Amino acid sequence: ARQGFPVRVFEQSPEFREVGAGIQLGPNIFRVLDKIGLKEAVLDDAHRPPAQEMRDAVTGKLITRVPLDDAFFKRFGQPYAVTHRADLHATILNACLGNDLIKLETNQRVDGFEDSGDGVVATLGNGSRVNGRALIGCDGMWSTIRESIVGDGKPRVSGHIAYRAVLKRSDVPDDLWRPDVVLWAGPRTHFVHYPLRRGELYNLVAVFHSDHYEEGWNAEGSTELLWQHFKGQRPEVLRMLERIETWRMWVL
């Protein structure tokens, strides 16, 4: 659309929305956001952590610390930040809504496509066909478009499961609050936490190996299973985990 081409976006859900949790944004993505004019809008909602840390989840020992300061910016030319997926999604959505060349269409699933020689014909779930110069498959991990082109089958489960949750700043004890992105590395586990939305929220991600899962990215996780994998770890880790009553499970 920035080059003058009309664009139609087909979304199979009833509305455009994002219900995930935190996401880390490195210099590469900020280079793209800068190019399309959204960098500052994204940074307005984001948190700029002073550093990334990795600690041993059993001993508490600091393994490494990577400052994300002026030297980092000078080296890579762009910042590092963390933000809520819903905030990032809203910024991009609002930019699309403000462009007359972009038409957003909900309740529309792309089931397939054909190469017409000088363009492409997409078949929608309601049976209608749409002509265009090009088709960009942005339909995620379970992509129909990718499967049609590459033929690589269904995604393979890695054995890693991520449990996600978000806390309000007021629900995090002061002695557990850290402005950094912190990763606690344990036996076949890791636990990550960092602030979101200018420090108003706190993002938690607990990852472990398990054969017990449901396909998808938003099922409810088992607290009992989580504790089986994280028992014996540092009090800081366990105290943070116990503050969450409901986890959302994300199979990797």
Positions of PLM-derived features:
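Glycine-rich FAD pyrophosphate-binding loop
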Residues: 1-21
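FAD/FMN-dependent oxidoreductases across multiple families
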Residues: 175-176, 187-189, 197-200, 208-252
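A structural signal for isolated positions on well-ordered beta-strands in alpha/beta enzyme cores
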Residues: 8, 103, 192, 203-205
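Conserved N-terminal helical subregion
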Residues: 26-168, 211-227
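Short beta-strand micro-motifs enriched in acidic
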Residues: 115-116, 194-196
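Short phosphate-binding/catalytic loops that engage adenosine nucleotides
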Residues: 5, 38, 235
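Flavin-dependent oxidoreductases
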Residues: 161-194
